[in-house]
Curated annotation (Swiss-Prot):
S-adenosyl-L-methionine binds at residues 185, 213, 218, 234, 294. Belongs to the class I-like SAM-binding methyltransferase superfamily. RNA M5U methyltransferase family. TrmA subfamily. It is an enzyme of class 2 (transferase). The active site is at 319 (nucleophile), 353 (proton acceptor). InterPro entries: MeTrfase_TrmA_AS, MeTrfase_TrmA_CS, SAM-dependent_MTases_sf, TrmA_MeTrfase, U5_MeTrfase_fam. Dual-specificity methyltransferase that catalyzes the formation of 5-methyluridine at position 54 (m5U54) in all tRNAs, and that of position 341 (m5U341) in tmRNA (transfer-mRNA). HAMAP family: RNA_methyltr_TrmA. This is tRNA/tmRNA (uracil-C(5))-methyltransferase. Its EC number is 2.1.1.-, 2.1.1.35. SUPFAM superfamilies: S-adenosyl-L-methionine-dependent methyltransferases (SSF53335).
Length: 360
């Protein structure tokens, strides 16, 4: 990827040596830490990111500078999906034609996907009202997008507050509602590779699946075809709401989503505590043999790590090699690593996603 803002814009913290060399160095650091040789899944080198946030300064998009305080104004971003790339300049021109839209506009967020749908969030340091809504509605129609306006204590939605993403996984298309402000995988091309890697493992497994940290069902729905039943849990209310909508959109009937933290799942499975949220679910009816976890950067807490060790098969997706290494030191006391992979979700940064499959 060639970008005139390399070395200035802080969104890409690695910019020397080219993409292949950067990825090679990240993989080498992973291999040194784990002593394992992973399967490598690279990213597209440009136009790969499905969400982006930009400050808005004097009618221009801006990002934080790389090695110093302050902002650098930009007219384009090579990282973002083609749909966002094409939208950025058109949106800026229309915003700047309407003072009511540009006045004290603090930030502009973009959310898009392989489906081509786009949602823009405009965040203000002033109240927004009906006059703002009228102007925003005009540009939403002109650009065929949805818009969410936000100011302190107020939200105005023009159209929908989500996009419907279409992910082709093993030649089957899955639909996902990605809501404004909620977590979604940032790189859909690498996300598909992650799901398919997990799917190649799951197709040879037996029994039922327990998934912790399921989010809006990104892995749940494609993996559900390989199991008799799936119980998927997540603590975030909006993610569970989206997950239930997504399972209905796809006509999948062997998945139950429940709002529980990983600690609460541990308590429920061990009979330590009863939960009203589980009153319509018979935990004893499940034949759990596989657990799938995709925890936050902090990794697994002690109780969840002990619970995970009780399963025959563990599929672990990690966004932090350091906490994955800590967790594997414990999991490896009862399980053996069968497969390991790295996924370059975040090109031009030090970050590296990884996946590990362990069996007892």
């Amino acid at each position: 990827m060639e970008c005139k803002y390399f070395g200035k814009c802080g969104s890409c913290s690695l910019y020397e040596g080219g993409y292949e060399e950067q990825l090679q160095k990240k993989v080498h650091e992973f291999e040194k830490l784990f002593g394992l040789e992973p399967e490598i899944f690279p990213s597209k080198q440009s136009r790969y990111r499905a969400r982006a946030e930009f400050r808005y300064i004097d009618g221009e998009y801006a990002m934080h500078r790389l090695h110093e305080k302050g902002l650098v104004t930009i007219d384009a971003c090579e990282m973002v999906l083609e749909s966002i790339y094409e939208l950025m300049s058109k949106l800026r021109l229309l915003i700047n034609k309407h003072e009511i839209l540009s006045n004290r506009l603090y930030r502009v967020d973009f959310l898009s996907g392989l489906s081509g749908e786009s949602l823009v969030t405009m965040v203000y340091h002033r109240p927004i009202d009906e006059a703002w809504e009228k102007a925003a509605n005009e540009i939403a129609k002109a650009l065929h997008i949805d818009i969410v306006g936000r100011s302190r204590g107020k939200k105005i939605v023009i159209g929908k507050e989500y996009i419907t993403e279409k992910l082709p996984v093993f030649e089957k298309e899955f639909l996902f509602r990605h809501y404004e402000g909620s977590f979604t995988q940032p790189n859909p091309y690498v996300n598909i590779k992650m799901i398919e890697w997990a799917g190649r493992i799951a197709k040879d497994l037996q029994g039922d699946l327990l998934e912790l940290y399921c989010g809006a069902g990104n892995f749940t729905l494609p993996l559900s075809r390989y199991f008799e039943k799936v119980l998927a849990t997540e603590v975030n209310k909006s993610s569970i709401k989206a997950a239930k909508e997504n399972v209905a959109l796809n006509g999948i009937e062997n998945v139950e989503f429940v709002r529980l933290s990983s600690q609460e799942v541990t308590q429920a499975l061990r009979g330590v505590r009863d939960f009203r949220r589980l009153e319509n679910i018979d935990l004893h009816s499940y034949n759990f043999q596989t657990v799938f976890v995709d925890p936050p950067r902090c990794g697994l807490d002690d109780d969840t790590r002990e619970l995970v060790r009780e399963f025959d098969n563990i599929v672990y997706i990690s966004c932090n090699p350091q906490t994955l290494h800590r967790d594997l030191e414990e999991l490896s006391k009862t399980h053996t690593v069968q497969k390991v992979a790295v996924f370059d979700q975040f090109p031009y940064t030090p970050h590296l996603e990884s996946g590990v499959y362990l069996t007892r």
